[in-house]
Amino acid sequence: MKHSVHFGAGNIGRGFIGEILFKNGFHIDFVDVNNQIIHALNEKGKYEIEIAQKGQSRIEVTNVAGINSKEHPEQVIEAIQKTDIITTAIGPNILPFIAELLAKGIEARRVAGNTQALDVMACENMIGGSQFLYQEVKKYLSPEGLTFADNYIGFPNAAVDRIVPAQSHEDSLFVVVEPFNEWVVETKRLKNPDLRLKDVHYEEDLEPFIERKLFSVNSGHATSAYIGAHYGAKTILEALQNPNIKSRIESVLAEIRSLLIAKWNFDKKELENYHKVIIERLENPFIVDEVSRVARTPIRKLGYNERFIRPIRELKELSLSYKNLLKTVGYVFDYRDVNDEESIRLGELLAKQSVKDVVIQVTGLDDQELIEQIVEYI
């Protein structure tokens, strides 16, 4: 049986990446620091995924195990030494924390003489995630390890898309996911091109697809949350049931479409259909997606290269409309949740400093005209 190591045994890891790896015939070693999840994986050796649609079918994922990377790093290194593929779903901010362990695993492959090509795919909500991880891993590799990695270890970037809402079940491994999923991998950085996963798309140039996903799904999803919060909606479905909110989301997606078509020459009709499907996904009555989950960490989401400011910058450069995105950014600055540290911090910054200074600090912008435009909407 083929072997995989997956960092991150959370809902996305189990409910998306784990399902695909299982369907491709892999044994999966889930690596995490959550002892409850790791214990359950080792005790049961399987878990169930429910598809959030009419009929609510279930998939049983078997041949799984767990490794606590904090308690047993040596087991992770051993697993990396023999594995056929490595994936992650831990969040962009956590990637640097697994770099040293990955480097030790790569060194172990070198010492053992394992020259089977291996690809490491960071399945995160970020542009260039795998290459970012590689830069972190390189810091811990010996000169020999660097040469070995250059020859045998690939870090192809990936774009992933599946809505997995926050949830809690008596069975800690059980997870509910939406029917839709998309996983795209760039081919040019693959070291093991013969290992092709079914239900995964492979593209020579990934950047258009990553931007299509981040600027469409992430921007649209977040827009529904921040506007929804402004109007008192508690779930994304509730937000979409408000015609005013739905219309605003569609207006934001129209601006995103104009950017993607101008920049990447996407087919207009295909992109319109892609955005129609996004709206349908957000309206899924079988998913309870809390506004508070989608709207959390507003400071991060207002970043220079994030889902709002980056498309706004690029639309401005192309002299295309971004008025609806600007309005949404205003709602992001207004968002408050007592349980979200970043939203509280954002409120504190606005109370202590001028709005303009906070906009500059949070967005990293130096375009004075654009800064003033954002200030007008706060």
Curated annotation (Swiss-Prot):
Gene Ontology CC terms, in alphabetical order: cytosol
Family of this protein: Belongs to the mannitol dehydrogenase family.
Molecular-function GO term, any one: mannitol-1-phosphate 5-dehydrogenase activity
Chain positions recorded as NAD(+) binding sites: 4-15
Entry annotated with the keyword Methyltransferase: no
Gene that produces this protein: mtlD
SUPFAM superfamilies in alphabetical order: 6-phosphogluconate dehydrogenase C-terminal domain-like, NAD(P)-binding Rossmann-fold domains
Pfam families xref list: Mannitol_dh (PF01232), Mannitol_dh_C (PF08125)
Protein name, as recorded: Mannitol-1-phosphate 5-dehydrogenase
Species assigned in the record: Streptococcus pneumoniae serotype 4 (strain ATCC BAA-334 / TIGR4)
GO biological-process terms attached to the record: mannitol catabolic process
HAMAP family, per database record: Mannitol_dehydrog (MF_00196)
Reaction equation(s) it catalyzes: D-mannitol 1-phosphate + NAD(+) = beta-D-fructose 6-phosphate + NADH + H(+)
